[in-house]
């Protein structure tokens, strides 16, 4: 049985896109939005929701699917209040890009509600099925909502021990009706994998963009050999001199590499901190590669350098063909 009423807590890009997709593909579903201003008012102006709620309790009343669609720290903070008002037969899910902290918040909450028995199947409490749609944008807010955001995208479900089988199946069917491909993996595997394929790459993109931004602050500084690295002035075709800043000469390659550095720093600080240890291990793996490349450069070892570059190129070309 498909869901009849969906409460979406968080009305920015992800929550708004989910509402738009549900509106377009499952028009019989009633959509209730709960979020901060000005997002919720703008979402209502855009017709993304049938109704707005002024409290979590109001949002959850009558819902058979509840979606945590706010930033991850907000989702974690909402869990106790959501659990207190979640209808017994409802399914709770989230759109967080890190699973561990939300699952921990849920388990602590249900343990407190059931006198310390940290069991998933607590009588009278709805069913939490963690979820992560692998989709997004460097834009935010309800104006960025895209009804096709999830089409042909992967959605990862991380079922918990004790989940009702029909909860997982209904949620999977919902995402498939929105055009997504569904994969299941454990919470721990999810956070390890996405630390390497998403979280560490975002950190790298921000770092490269920051290094480019810092260039030109000290024109004419010595290079590693103590020689002048340049006068720090460029002559344009109109004869005017201008300070040399590397970023002024960036081409498509740098723009491709740093595109995701246009995302919200506040959002990504939250994600990186919430997935701290897996992301640190992923950054260490990237750093080990960079150090190997650096050593090959330092020693002039063309064979080693080519091999390191080839390993990356092989994966990229294979992924581009089949990914």
Labelled PLM ranges:
Residues 149-228, 232-260:
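Internal alpha-helical scaffold of NAD(P)-dependent oxidoreductase catalytic cores
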Residues 56-86, 90-93:
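Rossmann-like NAD(P)-binding element
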Residues 5, 28-30, 127, 154, ...:
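Residues at the starts of beta-strands that form the adenosine-phosphate
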Residues 1-61:
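NAD(P)+-binding Rossmann beta1-loop-alpha1 motif at the extreme N-terminus of oxidoreductases
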Residues 243-312:
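Interdomain hinge/lid region at the active-site interface
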Residues 81-143:
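Rossmann-like NAD(P)(H) cofactor-binding subdomain of soluble oxidoreductases
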Residues 3-5, 89, 152:
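Phosphate-coordination loops involved in phosphoryl transfer and adenosine-cofactor binding
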């Amino acid at each position: 049985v498909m869901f009849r009423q969906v409460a979406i807590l968080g009305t920015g890009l992800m929550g708004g896109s989910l509402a738009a997709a549900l509106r377009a593909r499952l028009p019989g579903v009633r959509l209730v939005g709960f979020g901060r201003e000005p997002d919720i008012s703008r979402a209502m102006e855009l017709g993304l929701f049938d109704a707005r709620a002024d409290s979590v309790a109001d949002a959850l009343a009558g819902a058979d699917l509840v979606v945590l669609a706010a930033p991850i720290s907000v989702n974690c903070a909402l869990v106790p209040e959501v659990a207190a008002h979640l209808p017994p037969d409802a399914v709770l899910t989230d759109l967080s890009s890190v699973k561990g902290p939300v699952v921990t918040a849920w388990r602590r909450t249900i343990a407190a509600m059931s006198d310390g028995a940290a069991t998933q199947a607590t009588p009278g409490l709805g069913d939490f099925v963690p979820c992560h749609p692998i989709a997004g944008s460097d834009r935010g807010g309800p104006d960025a909502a895209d009804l096709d955001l999830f089409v042909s995208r992967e959605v990862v479900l991380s079922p918990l021990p004790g989940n009702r089988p029909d909860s997982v199946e209904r949620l999977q069917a919902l995402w498939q009706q929105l055009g997504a491909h569904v994969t299941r993996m454990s919470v721990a595997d999810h956070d390890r994998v996405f630390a390497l394929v998403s979280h560490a790459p975002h950190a790298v993109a921000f770092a490269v963009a920051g290094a480019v931004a810092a260039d030109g602050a000290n024109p004419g500084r010595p290079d590693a050999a103590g020689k002048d690295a340049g006068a720090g002035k460029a002559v344009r075709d109109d004869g005017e001199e201008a300070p040399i800043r590397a970023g002024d000469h960036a081409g498509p390659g740098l723009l491709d590499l740093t595109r995701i550095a246009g995302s919200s720093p506040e959002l990504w600080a939250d994600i990186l901190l919430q997935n701290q240890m897996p992301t640190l291990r992923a950054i260490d793996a990237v750093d080990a590669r960079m150090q190997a490349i650096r050593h090959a450069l330092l020693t002039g070892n063309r064979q080693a350098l080519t091999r390191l570059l080839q390993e990356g190129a092989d994966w990229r070309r294979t992924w581009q063909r089949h990914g």
